[in-house]
Structure formats: C-alpha cells, structure tokens
Amino acid sequence: MSKIYDWFEERLEIQAIADDITSKYVPPHVNIFYCFGGITLTCFLIQVATGFAMTFYYRPTVTEAFASVEYIMTNVNFGWLIRSIHRWSASMMVMMLILHVFRVYLTGGFKKPRELTWVTGVILAVITVSFGVTGYSLPWDQVGYWAVKIVTGVPDAIPVIGAPLVELLRGSVSVGQSTLTRFYSLHTFVLPLLTAVFMLMHFLMIRKQGISGPL
C-alpha cells in the first residue's frame, strides 16, 4: 500500500496539498456566523444526492410527471423521505444563503480586494432562485403549472423583446411539454453545472484571499 502511495506522492505531491489544506490560517474573529456559506454548500450537496436519486423514477412529461412524483412518495422505498429531504434542504439552502449574504455585507466582506468573490456569490444567489423556480414546476400539479405560467409570462411586459422571451422560456407560445422539458433540463443539468463552476471560483478566491477581517 505504501508503494502505491509513494508512486502518487512522487507525481502529485499529495502531502504538500494536504498540508496546505489543513494548515490554512483562520483569523481569531471568525465565529459561528461565518459558517452560513459552508452550510449552504452542504445543503447543495444534499440537493444533488437526493435529486439524483429521484431522477431514477421521475418522468418529465406532462402526462406522467405528477404520477411519477406520487409513485416516489408512496411506492419507492424511502422515496417520501428522499423527496422530503430534498424540499427541506432547498428551503434551508435559501435561508442559509440569505443569512450568508447579510453576514458578508455587514462585515464588509464585499470590499476590495474581494469584489469578484462578491460577484460570484451574487451569481450563485441568482442561480439558487432559479433552482427554486424550475424545481417548483416539476411535479406538474396545479400549483406548479400556474407558477410556471405566471413566471414565464413576466417578460411579456418588456417592449419589443417581451414576446420572444416568453416563447423562449416556454418553448412555445403556451405552457406545455416543451416548457416542462426545458425546466427539467435547467434544474437537473444546466443549473447544477453552473453552480459547481461558480462555487469552485468562489472557493478558490476565498482560499487565495483569505477570510475578511473584522470591521
């Protein structure tokens, strides 16, 4: 086993990487309120795990979506628990994100030289809201359907480009199968990928610049 480790160590310098990760200086003013960002990340990972589990049973069609969610809740082993955890962690993620934003703002963590860290955080906040909008529609019940109809209809008030934007969001002039397919693709592939990319950027900048000092 040691020979295998030595082989990787010689090429990747694993010990140096481990030492750098475990020996990072943490300022003495850091307290429990600085944990909100980490809790948000934890909620996202829970979302990924539980969401991935549900993709095995969910069917993104207007005729089968609601029935597949019902099947998850009533027939799949621990399906009710997995979906409930997905919903609870979604709410927790939004709440922790809001608290994290307030903490960063109140402690001046957005100021020079951390402007780009703040920008990536704002982008992540927008993506998080988009998760909520797209995920809300997936059961395709009455609440989800009308929520999608209202949200996708908002851009219609924009002069000139409003109508094309609505059609782009819905996939057609009205809410239907194309809309559900787009929202499902956004919720399960596009948004998670964007979140992973911007989270990586966010953490690398925090790692490089360190935690902001007290006011």
Swiss-Prot record:
Bilayer-spanning residue ranges? 32-52, 90-110, 116-136, 186-206
Which residues of this UniProt protein bind heme b 2?
H86, H187
List of residues binding heme b 1: H100, H202
Against InterPro entries, the record matches this protein to:
Cyt_b/b6_N (IPR005797), Cyt_B6_PetB (IPR023530), Cytb/b6-like_sf (IPR027387), Cytochrome_b_N_euk/bac (IPR048259), Di-haem_cyt_TM (IPR016174)
Which GO molecular function, any one, fits this protein according to its record? oxidoreductase activity
Compartments (UniProt record): Plastid, Chloroplast thylakoid membrane
GO BP annotations of the record are: photosynthesis; respiratory electron transport chain
Q: Where does heme c bind?
A: C35
Q: Which UniProt keywords apply?
A: Chloroplast, Electron transport, Heme, Iron, Membrane, Metal-binding, Photosynthesis, Plastid, Thylakoid, Transmembrane, Transmembrane helix, Transport
What protein family does this chain belong to?
Belongs to the cytochrome b family. PetB subfamily.
Whom does it interact with, and what assembly results?
Answer: The 4 large subunits of the cytochrome b6-f complex are cytochrome b6, subunit IV (17 kDa polypeptide, PetD), cytochrome f and the Rieske protein, while the 4 small subunits are PetG, PetL, PetM and PetN. The complex functions as a dimer.
Please share what else the UniProt entry notes about this protein.
Heme 1 (or BH or b566) is high-potential and absorbs at about 566 nm, and heme 2 (or BL or b562) is low-potential and absorbs at about 562 nm.
The name of this protein is Cytochrome b6
Could you tell me which species this protein originates from? Nephroselmis olivacea
What phylogenetic lineage does the species belong to?
A: Eukaryota, Viridiplantae, Chlorophyta, Nephroselmidophyceae, Nephroselmidales
Q: Which gene encodes it?
A: petB
